[in-house]
Curated annotation (Swiss-Prot):
It comes from the Eukaryota. The lineage of its organism: Eukaryota, Metazoa, Ecdysozoa, Nematoda, Chromadorea. Belongs to the actin family. PROSITE patterns: ACTINS_1, ACTINS_2, ACTINS_ACT_LIKE. GO terms for molecular function: ATP binding; hydrolase activity. It comes from Brugia malayi. This is Actin.
Length: 376
């Protein structure tokens, strides 16, 4: 088949948002929540042509009558039937393409279970009949998007956080660290601390409201203790937020207590290290000769890194951990919310990449296991 004239599709399936579009574009065409919603009550909308499931924005807008489920948890697909619905929605409703006509580049979390990657491959070839596909590691794509081939990526999205050291384009698997603490946990934590203040947020629909509060009002304090003192002594840090029903709530130290959990997971009752220490530990697992390059190229990626103040705080924390003479540079590209997708768009449109695709023919000859041989 002539790959030249057919644009490849790039789909970055995140735990929170699905980003999809065409290789060669500079931004995804479609960005929608990775949600499948099902009616809570049977037959409440008789004659409305009610569907048995809704995907993405439509599920989000009808959330009041639906139970919302995220098929991707902690970066890994846990519900394949729902995942298939999301892919179907991506091809036919969002991009409006026939998947059997385009090669598809999918992304996956680092250290993804082998079976997951095989299942993705199988669904693409057997359910959607794609002519070719490839599975790339998310963090590596983020680094490509920043124009580098060496560096360490701290990728923190909605479901999972990874620190991935990459040297000359290859992820170093022995030094990848994973932290099951990301945006969704911060949302849950904000729900909890707002509930402690007497506001009630419990349902899956209300969780989405809290996510919005988090995205609009939270920030990372450079000095947590000092910020707490400021918040206690004045109302300068307080902000108000109007709920969908018109009620106005005031949020004070919760604004920075919520994302502080990234640096102090003990806030969530977790025994893990914070994102700064995880990044540092990852660098320390690498060969001593390349550490300098990693410290100087620490790239933030993923939606949770969009929280204001995170780069300065990372700079401060890593400087405190690293040798005193080390040059440390935290790179936070403005488009980092989509840098995985952008990296995929770059990769899939390279002429040198075209022989890397797994073709339908190779799949038919070798089965799903081919993915481990072709996608390192």
């Amino acid at each position: 088949m002539g790959d030249e004239e057919v644009a490849a599709l790039v789909i970055d399936n995140g735990s929170g948002m699905c980003k999809a579009g065409f290789a060669g574009d500079d931004a995804p065409r479609a960005v929608f929540p990775s949600i499948v919603g099902r009616p809570r009550h049977q037959g409440v909308m008789v004659g409305m042509g009610q569907k048995d499931s809704y995907v993405g924005d439509e599920a989000q807008s009808k959330r009041g009558i639906l139970t919302l489920k995220y098929p991707i948890e902690h970066g890994i697909v846990t519900n394949w039937d729902d995942m298939e619905k999301i892919w179907h929605h991506t091809f036919y409703n969002e991009l409006r393409v026939a998947p059997e006509e385009h090669p598809v580049l999918l992304t996956e979390a680092p250290l993804n279970p082998k079976a997951n990657r095989e299942k993705m491959t199988q669904i693409m070839f057997e359910t959607f009949n794609t002519p070719a596909m490839y599975v790339a590691i998310q963090a590596v794509l983020s680094l490509y998007a920043s124009g580098r081939t060496t560096g360490i990526v701290l990728d923190t999205g909605d479901g999972v956080t990874h620190s991935v050291p990459i040297y000359e384009g290859y992820a170093l698997p022995h030094a990848i660290l994973r932290l099951d603490l990301a945006g969704r946990d911060l949302t849950d934590y904000l729900m909890k601390i707002l509930t402690d203040r007497g506001y009630s947020f419990t349902t899956t629909a209300e969780r989405e409201i809290v996510r919005d509060i988090k995205e609009k009002l939270c920030y990372v304090a450079l000095d947590f203790e000092q910020e707490m003192a400021t918040a206690a002594s004045s109302s300068s840090l307080e902000k108000s937020y109007e709920l969908p029903d018109g009620q106005v709530i005031t949020i004070g130290n919760e604004r920075f207590r919520c994302p502080e959990a990234l640096f102090q997971p003990s806030f969530l009752g977790m025994e893990s290290t914070g994102i700064h220490e995880t990044t540092y530990n990852s660098i320390m697992k690498c060969d001593v000769d390349i550490r300098k390059d990693l410290y100087a190229n620490t790239v933030l990626s993923g939606g949770t890194t969009m929280v204001p103040g995170i780069a300065d705080r990372m700079q401060k924390e890593i400087t405190a951990l690293a040798p005193s003479t080390m040059k440390i540079k935290i790179i936070a590209p403005p488009e980092r919310k989509y840098s995985v997708w952008i990296g995929g768009s770059i990769l899939a449109s390279l002429s040198t990449f075209q022989q890397m695709w797994i073709s339908k023919q190779e799949y038919d000859e070798s089965g799903p296991g081919i993915v481990h041989r072709k996608c390192f």
